[in-house]
Amino acid sequence: MRWFALALFALAFALSIRPALRVPVVEPSKPADRCSAALEFWAGPSVVGRPVRSSPAVLADVLARLPNQEYWRDQTDPTDLVTWTHEGTHGVSVRVPKVRGAHGIYLLGGRSVSIAHPRLTIGDVAAAIPESQRGRIYQLYLVEQRRDWDAEPIYLVEEWVAYVHGTFARRELGLSARGETEDFAREMEFYCRVMLALAAKVDPNYPDAEKLAAFIEWNSERFRRAVE
């Protein structure tokens, strides 16, 4: 099966890199041509009220779709636009229409994606990651967050997307600080690739296997284009 071959490639790739490595962007709203056939994007969530004028543009996109914008701002540092973009992405993702057994994620440009969860847990993914390749956010997302998200492993993909959007904000702002946002995006990509490879082994009938594989390549490419 094509997706199984992609998963084997993902496993080889994942085990050959360290989370802190620069890994592979496409414009935020444009998938790579080689991935588009397996991907299905949804419209929305819609703009809530009047569009927000803000810098960076990625933050304006997110805020325009949040009815409670201030809730997602970092209250300890209200000037932190990178974190506001990251957290706001989660807020808009909450508004993506729910599909039983799947996870919705907002992708900018008025588009979103819904990906079914494979039959594994975040704990399973955590156990599949060699100790030598467990990065700075491993403890938070693959250990502590299991209290709320263990049975919903595509949550890891949403966190990766949020870090990618934070990277777009950092680059638009021209910040020398906040480089960890990009490091964490690379680290989360690594964990998502491990999850894809694991799903190929433990859930061979996973219905969204090709979609997840294609999405990983799409999101990786748009990140790479932003940081090159």
Features from the language model and the residues they span:
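N-terminal hydrophobic targeting signals that begin at the initiator methionine
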Residues: M1-R2
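Hydrophobic membrane-insertion alpha-helices, especially the h-region
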Residues: A5-S16
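N-terminal low-complexity, Pro/Thr/Ser-rich intrinsically disordered segments
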Residues: L21-A57
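An N-terminal structural lobe/cap that precedes and organizes the functional/catalytic core
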Residues: S55-Q69
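Short pre-active-site segment immediately N-terminal to the catalytic Zn-binding motif
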Residues: L66-W84
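Active-site recognition of the HExxH zinc-binding catalytic motif
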Residues: L81-K98
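Post-HEXXH active-site segment of zinc metalloproteases
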Residues: V94-V143
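Long, well-structured alpha-helical subdomains associated
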Residues: I137-E228
